[in-house]
Amino acid sequence: MASFVAGQQGKEPAFESYPVRVESKTARAIDFRNSPGASKFRTRLREAIKGDVNFAGRYIISGWGCGSGCSQMAIIDAKTGRVFMPDALAGVSAWYYDVEDDYEVYTYKKNSRLLVVRGAPGPMTDGDTEQEPGSYYYEWRPNRLRLIKFVPRPKPKNA
């Protein structure tokens, strides 16, 4: 699947191509009972649920560091309080060379199902991921991320 996605040609996916209606938040607390793994991040998730919807119409994305050059994220359903922790967000190793000044590891919008991750996503093993660094374009489907395109990182100018 990854080689198929990496081999796709054409423009990078646009947020406007994945529209969604923004709903109001109704959850007041995190549903730890139905959110495997979420209890390890209680403080961060409890703070996040206090905020407004910021992704895919009814979700709140929250993130935290997991070491030098590493970050993790969770997606909270703002209607139910349930937390989703996709493997792709369980330790993104960021890359920093040959990128624009306004570089962001994660890019998302509250009115779009598109999530862009720049780095090497996936669970960290021995301080590294098995994924190739680059820009990963995911579509949020009910309760999961679907990889729709991968663009390898640019080679360093000095290489």
Q: Each PLM stretch: what is its role?
A:
Residues 4-52:
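Terminal domain-start segments
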Residues 4-23, 107-159:
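Acidic, small-residue rich beta-repeat scaffolds with periodic aromatic anchors
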Residues 24-37, 75-87, 132, 137-150:
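Surface-exposed loop/turn elements that mediate protein-protein interactions on large endomembrane-trafficking
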Residues 48-54, 102-111:
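Structural signature of eukaryotic scaffold interfaces centered on beta-propeller domains
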Residues 57-64, 113-119:
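Short beta-strand elements that form the blades of beta-propeller/WD-repeat-like
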Residues 68-73, 99-103, 131-134:
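Short, surface-exposed coil-to-beta transition loops
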Residues 88-97, 155:
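Surface-exposed loop and turn segments in beta-propeller and other repeat-based domains
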